[in-house]
Amino acid sequence: MKLNKMFLVGALLSLGFASCSKEGNGPDPDNAAKSYMSMTLSMPMGSARAGDGQDQANPDYHYVGEWAGKDKIEKVSIYMVPQGGPGLVESAEDLDFGTYYENPTIDPATHNAILKPKKGIKVNSAVGKTVKVYVVLNDIAGKAKALLANVNAADFDAKFKEIIELSTQAQALGTVADGPNPATAAGKIAKKNGTTDETIMMTCLQPSDALTIEAAVSEANAIAGIKNQAKVTVERSVARAMVSTKAQSYEIKATTQIGEIAAGSVLATITDIRWVVAQGERRQYLSKKRGTVPENTWVTPGSGFVPTSSTFHTNATEYYDYAGLWEDHNTNEAVISGTQVPTLADYQLQDVTGELANALSGKFLLPNTHKSGANAASSDYKRGNTAYVLVRAKFTPKKEAFIDRGKTYSDNTAVPEYVAGEDFFVGENGQFYVSMKSVTDPKVGGVAGMKAHKYVKGKVLYYAWLNPSTTSPDSWWNSPVVRNNIYHIHIKSIKKLGFNWNPLVPDPDPSNPENPNNPDPNPDEPGTPVPTDPENPLPDQDTFMSVEVTVLPWKVHSYEVDL
């Protein structure tokens, strides 16, 4: 597919790893060590067919290839866990990566990044014992260290799979008071270091094979792998969403007669296309956790939550993070908030500004999975529990689209002319109006008692699921988001008018449209319909946007969507 080749070429322009070497190597075990050990780290460019297709070398859905990324590994924490019962876990935490490891190399056979040791790790209490070695890289939030402190060997494996909370429920619901870029849950363990590289937390899926730590092994022999060398594979703890667009603007054509505009003629233009991501989880298992049914290979803390219209508002924040909706937020309603969506051509540029680099590099989120199914009844993926990309744009209809244009109200006052960039209303009959007054006045083309959607300053919204299970919008029942995967969404067209507000944000008082946690709230006009329901399944019965998604490992998934 031409798109995938172009995207991967652009992504691979930034291929590379970086190491960080600083003064001081972190905590160093007792200088009178009884032996040395070392550890070789392998980083696959993805995760691991099962019922939901996520446990394979080429995971469903829309898998197209791999992307090495540009990881900066700063710290390494190693845990030597004796096997066979209770005992002391010997650890070496926050070791400086640049001191202990060579720069990564790529294995041509497996395409894994291999991190070979250049300094041995002193061992004391683990000498003479058979251990398994667990690893955490870049514990930048200190969550792993806190979880694993003073854990007995017999309990360590279970503890390594427990939940870490990255954002509280309050932090997961941003407000305008938090500023334009509140910290997301994923942002606590994955950070972009300008345009150069990224520091992302990583953990091992499995510990090393059992290894007996022999006494009196020299540092040189441990480094060479002659004795006392463990091998562990690690993967990134977050997923990444990336969005691109075929064009920076689109023309929308009428499908029926709208005002004076005939079906098939240009109705409006779409410009200023921006995006944010939400409903990744706010917590995660420290190490990726396998599910008990094939329909959900990798479970997340919220895998069992299936919302109703009411429980979404009362319980969704127990599981999900919505702070990302406030990214690049502007308090001026006339300005479209969010990150500008780049074109595929932008990925080919050699000279990239900081702003464009931010757009090209995507956004991090925590994994979010549920039980998959072949229809609405069997799938647990619903609109209120599935990670989504929210696309915002400016919709400017032609003046001829307004059915009330040039007419006089029942009170003999003139209907004002529509001004581009101002509010407009779309009635349940599909016609455009300049005000709610026009919507209900039959004399100007309205209908008494008719409801309408208010579009504040022309802002429109579209949803895209990160990893839909089919290429057809009317049958994509599932959308698993798994760590160490990149989900690339390519907008190839925008076909219709989108939504006017976002109901997929928990509201502490659903009866009050003024939700302080929602940057795209209900405009609170009399009779404003709810665009979508959190308990609805994912498929669109009416397709607004055409999207192609590609999933990059990292595993890359990509698909196109028509909005």
UniProtKB/Swiss-Prot annotation:
Q: Which domain of life is it from?
A: Bacteria
User: Which of UniProt's keywords are assigned here?
Assistant: Cell outer membrane, Fimbrium, Lipoprotein, Membrane, Palmitate, Signal, Virulence
Q: Where is the lipid attached (N-palmitoyl cysteine)?
A: 20
Give any single GO term for biological process.
cell-cell adhesion
Q: Provide the primary localization.
A: other
Q: Where in the cell is it found?
A: Fimbrium; Cell outer membrane
One Pfam assignment: Fimbrillin_C
List every stretch annotated Disordered.
Answer: 504-543
User: Upon deletion of the gene, what happens?
Assistant: Mfa1-deficient cells show increased autoaggregation. Double mutants lacking both FimA and Mfa1 lack major and minor fimbriae; they fail to adhere to host cells.
PROSITE patterns documented for this protein: PROKAR_LIPOPROTEIN (PS51257)
Q: Where is the lipid attached (S-diacylglycerol cysteine)?
A: 20
- Signal peptide bounds: 1-19
How does the annotation summarize its subunit structure?
Structural component of the fimbrial stalk. Minor fimbriae are composed of a structural subunit, most often Mfa1, and the accessory subunits Mfa3, Mfa4 and Mfa5. Mfa1 interacts with Mfa2; this anchors the fimbrium in the membrane. Fimbrium assembly occurs by linear, head-to-tail oligomerization of fimbrial subunits. This is mediated via insertion of a C-terminal beta-strand from one subunit into a groove in the N-terminal domain of the following subunit. Interacts with S.gordonii ssp5.
The extra comment attached to this record reads: The name (minor fimbrium subunit) does not indicate the abundance of the protein, but is derived from the greater length of the major fimbriae. In strain ATCC 33277 and strain ATCC BAA-1703 / FDC 381, major fimbriae are 300 - 1600 nM in length and about 5 nm in diameter. In contrast, minor fimbriae are only about 80 - 120 nm long. This length difference is observed only in a small number of strains, including strain ATCC 33277 and strain ATCC BAA-1703 / FDC 381, and is due to a loss of function mutation in FimB, a protein that restricts fimbrial length in other strains.
**Similarity remark:** Belongs to the bacteroidetes fimbrillin superfamily.
Q: What does this protein do?
A: Structural subunit of the minor fimbriae. These filamentous pili are attached to the cell surface; they mediate biofilm formation, adhesion onto host cells and onto other bacteria that are part of the oral microbiome. They play an important role in invasion of periodontal tissues and are recognized as major virulence factors. Mfa1 orthologs from different strains have highly divergent sequences, and this correlates with pathogenicity.
* UniProt-recorded name of the protein: Minor fimbrium subunit Mfa1
